[in-house]
C-alpha cells in the first residue's frame, strides 16, 4: 500500500489561497466569485496593512475594475490570483531592492 505523503509547503500555500478565496466568496450570492463588497471585505481584513497605507480612497475601486477582466462585476478565482500574483511580484521586487546586489545566473 502506498504511503500518502504530507503536503509540501507550496501545496499548503495553494490550499490556503483557495480557502481564503472561499471564505469571502459567496456571501453575497454566487459561491464562485467575489462581489465588490466581498472583495472590499477581503482587502480590509486579509490585506489590511496594504489597504490602510493607500492614500487614494479610490484605489480599491480601481483595483477591482482592473482585476475584473471579463467586466461582470465579480472576481472569479483566476482574477483573484492575478491580484495575489501582482502583490507577490511587488513584494519580491521590494525584497530584491532591499538585499545587496548578487550576480544572477
UniProtKB/Swiss-Prot annotation:
Cell compartment(s), UniProt: Cytoplasm; Nucleus
Keyword Transcription: no
Protein name in the entry: Protein S100-A11
GO molecular function terms noted in the UniProt entry: cadherin binding involved in cell-cell adhesion; calcium ion binding; calcium-dependent protein binding; protein homodimerization activity; S100 protein binding
Lineage: Eukaryota, Metazoa, Chordata, Craniata, Vertebrata
Chief place of localization: cytoplasm
Subunit: Homodimer; disulfide-linked.
Residues modified to N6-acetyllysine: 3, 27
Gene that encodes it: S100A11
Domain of life, per lineage: Eukaryota
